[in-house]
Curated annotation (Swiss-Prot):
GO terms for molecular function: DNA binding; protein heterodimerization activity; transcription corepressor activity. This is Dr1-associated corepressor. Residues 172-192 have a biased composition (Pro residues). It comes from the Eukaryota. Residues 91-205 are annotated as: Disordered. Residues 138-155, 196-205 have a biased composition (Acidic residues). Phosphorylation reduces DNA binding, but has no effect on heterodimerization and TBP binding. GO terms for cellular component: nucleus. Belongs to the NC2 alpha/DRAP1 family. It is found in: Nucleus. Residues 98-108 have a biased composition (Basic and acidic residues).
Length: 205
């Protein structure tokens, strides 16, 4: 049986591209082939950007591509000059041992982000959900920058968590100990006499 070549069919959605194009008032009708061609051009552009960024990452002996690697790639390649504004706020790479430093820097940042420490019981878990719902990467970057700077501002939010009702702990049940008093008990009152019992029977009948 001959082996079938699997057709590479992953593309940027042409309908979305057409919608973006039509937001420009100067563009009227768009031929069906145009968004498809732009979709393929986007793929080729991303492929070249990621290959260059991958080379930068590997040259640093890093296992994870970071925004700093992308920034260096964009600054080194003249064809990516138009992207420099996007990465202007990204921190520069540090020396050859940068992988260890960057990973070390990320650890404490994660610790300061809301909802990541063990003491907070998901009080700010909704922020993580909001990130998934945001539409563009730039919105996500803005939100991530906000969460980085809000780390110090999050500490005043501890008192609302203290407003939860305090936990009530029950102590283990104590064994029954019969009461023994050092004082003598008074004599028991006399019980009902036989005559009283007969009177009570009369009332019952």
């Amino acid at each position: 049986m001959p082996s079938k070549k699997k057709k590479y069919n992953a593309r940027f959605p042409p309908a979305r591209i057409k919608k973006i194009m039509q937001t420009d008032e100067e563009i009227g009708k768009v031929a069906a082939a145009v968004p498809v061609i732009i979709s393929r051009a986007l793929e080729l552009f991303l492929e070249s950007l990621l290959k260059k960024a991958c080379q930068v990452t590997q040259s640093r002996n890093a296992k994870t591509m970071t925004t700093s690697h992308l920034k260096q790639c964009i600054e080194l390649e003249q064809q990516f000059d138009f992207l420099k504004d996007l990465v202007a706020s990204v921190p520069d790479m540090q020396g050859d041992g940068e992988d260890n430093h960057v990973d070390g820097d990320k650890g404490p940042r994660r610790g300061r982000k809301p909802g990541s420490s063990g003491r907070k019981n998901g009080g700010t878990g909704s922020k993580g959900k909001d990130k998934k719902l945001s539409g563009t990467d730039s919105e996500q970057e803005d939100e991530s920058e906000d969460t980085d700077t809000d780390g110090e501002e999050e500490t005043p939010q501890l008192p609302p968590q203290a407003s939860h009702p305090p936990a009530h702990f029950q102590s283990p049940p104590t064994p029954f100990i019969p009461f023994t008093s050092p004082l003598p008990l008074p004599p028991a009152p006399p019980g009902p006499s036989a005559a009283d019992a007969e009177d009570e029977e009369d009332y019952d009948s």
